[in-house]
Structure formats: C-alpha cells, structure tokens
C-alpha cells in the first residue's frame, strides 16, 4: 500500500524516542507491505467512520484514513492513548475522511 503523512503526524513522530520510534517504523513498514487493511495487526476500524482506522503502538494510537481508490493509507494523527479519543481529533478526522 502507499503511505502519506500529515504534518501533525510527522511532528508527533519526531518527538518519539526509543522503543516507540522503533515500533512506529516497524508498523509503517507493515502497512506498506500488507495487501489490505484487514491484514494489519493491532488495527481496528473506528466506530461511526467509513474509512478511518487506528493502530495501537504501545501507549500511542496512530489514526489513519484508508483511501480505497488509490490503495493509500493517509496517517493523520499520532497521539497518546489518553488523548486518542478526544472529540476534537475525531471531529477533525471525520471532516478529513469526507474530503
């Protein structure tokens, strides 16, 4: 699959250290190499969304939108578990999903 990153995702990824940075790079490689989203480990579809998913990376959550036409994963957010389901993030994700 193809992979794209938002500025917010890149900024959060650069702040990671140690095992989280390694885990994130492994997860991104997994995303690039799987044939479809259903094959990803630690990945779940977000309730109430059509093409938005989250991947668990330790105590962090990576949220992405899967664009079926281009077979592209657009990583939008990388946040700690405590912030992950904040209404602001989910509202913004919903807007981006709709285009």
Q: Which residues does each PLM region occupy?
A:
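A short, surface-exposed loop/turn module that caps and links secondary-structure elements
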Residues: 29-54
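Arg/Lys-rich, positively charged N-terminal/basic patches that mediate binding to nucleic acids
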Residues: 1-27
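Enriched for short, Lys/Arg-rich terminal
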Residues: 57-60, 65-99
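Active-site micro-motifs of SAM-dependent methyltransferase domains
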Residues: 11, 30, 80-83
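Short, flexible helix/strand-to-coil boundary loops that buttress conserved ligand/catalytic motifs
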Residues: 16-17, 35, 88-89
């Amino acid at each position: 699959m193809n992979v794209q990153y938002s500025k917010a995702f890149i900024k959060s990824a650069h702040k990671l250290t140690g095992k989280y940075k390694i885990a994130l790079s492994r997860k991104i490689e997994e995303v690039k190499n799987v044939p479809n989203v259903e094959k990803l480990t630690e990945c779940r579809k977000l309730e109430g969304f059509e093409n938005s998913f989250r991947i668990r990376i330790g105590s962090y959550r990576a949220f992405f939108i899967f664009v079926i036409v281009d077979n592209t994963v657009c990583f939008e957010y990388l946040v700690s578990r405590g912030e992950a389901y904040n209404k602001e993030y989910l509202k913004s994700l919903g807007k981006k999903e709709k285009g």
